[in-house]
């Protein structure tokens, strides 16, 4: 396995570990999710280019579009929650009150 794949997998697992450790704040959770999506995008791009799969050239672009939509929705929720409650603690949010 080439060294760059190991680096991308390490970045993914570090973001996953950060998501598990820093899950109390919504902002840190969103940053860790963005790190995971970025490493998935890099891995999909590398795999597509190295395997010369012409039918899969659109997959990294679609993944990047979904990551942008996820970031926009996450930031909108962060702004809404911080305006309503004044903080971004995840444990203070009750989904049954929405």
Curated annotation (Swiss-Prot):
One GO-annotated biological process of the protein: ATP synthesis coupled electron transport
Membrane topology summary: Multi-pass membrane protein
Top-rank taxon: Eukaryota
Chief localization: mitochondrion
Chain ranges passing through the membrane: 1-21, 29-49, 61-81
Pfam families attached to this UniProt entry: Oxidored_q2 (PF00420)
Location within or outside the cell: Mitochondrion inner membrane
UniProt keyword Zinc, yes or no: no
Protein's UniProt keywords contain Phosphoprotein: no
Disulfide bonds: none
Signal sequence region: none
Keywords: Electron transport, Membrane, Mitochondrion, Mitochondrion inner membrane, NAD, Respiratory chain, Translocase, Transmembrane, Transmembrane helix, Transport, Ubiquinone
InterPro entries in UniProt: NADH_UbQ_OxRdtase_chain4L/K, NUOK/Mnh_C1-like
E.C. no: 7.1.1.2
UniProt GO molecular function: NADH dehydrogenase (ubiquinone) activity
Reactions listed under catalytic activity: a ubiquinone + NADH + 5 H(+)(in) = a ubiquinol + NAD(+) + 4 H(+)(out)
A Gene Ontology term for the protein's cellular component: mitochondrial inner membrane
Family designation: Belongs to the complex I subunit 4L family.
Subunit-level organization: Core subunit of respiratory chain NADH dehydrogenase (Complex I) which is composed of 45 different subunits.
Function in brief: Core subunit of the mitochondrial membrane respiratory chain NADH dehydrogenase (Complex I) which catalyzes electron transfer from NADH through the respiratory chain, using ubiquinone as an electron acceptor. Part of the enzyme membrane arm which is embedded in the lipid bilayer and involved in proton translocation.
Protein name: NADH-ubiquinone oxidoreductase chain 4L
Name of the gene encoding the protein in the UniProt record: MT-ND4L
């Amino acid at each position: 396995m080439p060294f760059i794949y190991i680096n991308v997998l390490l970045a993914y697992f570090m973001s996953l570990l950060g998501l598990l450790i820093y899950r109390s704040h919504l902002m840190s959770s969103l940053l860790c999710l963005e790190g995971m999506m970025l490493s998935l995008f890099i891995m999909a791009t590398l795999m597509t280019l190295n395997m010369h799969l012409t039918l899969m050239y659109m997959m990294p672009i679609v993944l990047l579009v979904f990551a942008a939509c996820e970031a926009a929705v996450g930031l909108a929720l962060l702004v809404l929650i911080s305006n309503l409650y004044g903080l971004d603690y995840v444990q203070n949010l009750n989904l049954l009150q929405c």
